[in-house]
Amino acid sequence: VLPCDDATPQESGLPARALARAGCRTLLYSANSGSMRVDVQPGSFLAFTDHVNFSGFNPLSTEREDGGWPTPYLSMAELYEARLTTDFVAAVEAAGVSMHSGVAGYWTGPSFETPAEIRLAQLAGCSISSNSFLPEVMAGYHAGMRVVAFTFVSTMSAGLGPPIALDPVLGLTRKAHDDFRTILRASIPAVAADRGPASG
């Protein structure tokens, strides 16, 4: 459940924390997004190398060093671990699915972003806009998991294409079912085989 569906950021991160408690070492997360780049068209995939949080909240803001969790005052510099992301992209492309890389911009939604917000995000170096991913990946990383995140690009961001509507976004996403299956089948063994250190 996402913040745009009336969950708190902390509640949105609970599934990732549960996976960490169950012993998972790596979180492979997929999102849906709009593109800010002309070379990343709807129907494309993009792996995250970093993110910019435009939401005004931090999902770790109420976390404390209790319950077995580490300090919430942790560096985000290696949230999207470069080596693990490189392994992920290589495995996916070897399976025949093209994977771009770039910086993700995060908003809570549920409304789509304004053209002015997208222009600001482009100045910040963002490649895509999304209202899912941030609470989950930050909670997973805080809980000690390594993180790989990617997105399916289902539309162009506001001001860069036709007006955004939900039905076409969902329709294009459904058509990508086979590519999603290929990505998961190819990448899960690759990221599981990379036994680098988890954070925390």
Task: Write out the residue ranges for each language-model feature.
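Metabolite-binding pocket within alpha/beta catalytic cores that recognizes anionic/polar moieties
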Residues: 1-76
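General beta-strand structural signal in soluble alpha/beta enzymes
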Residues: 27-31, 47, 99-105, 128-131, ...
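Active-site rim beta-loop-alpha module in soluble metabolic enzymes
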Residues: 77-122
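Zn-dependent metallopeptidase/amidohydrolase metal-coordination segment
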Residues: 131-169
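Alpha-helix C-terminal capping segments
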Residues: 20-26, 39, 124, 138-146
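Polyanion-binding loop/helix "lid" in catalytic or ligand-binding cores
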Residues: 69-80, 86, 118, 172-185
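His/Asp/Glu-rich mid-to-C-terminal helical/loop segments that flank catalytic regions of hydrolases
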Residues: 157-200
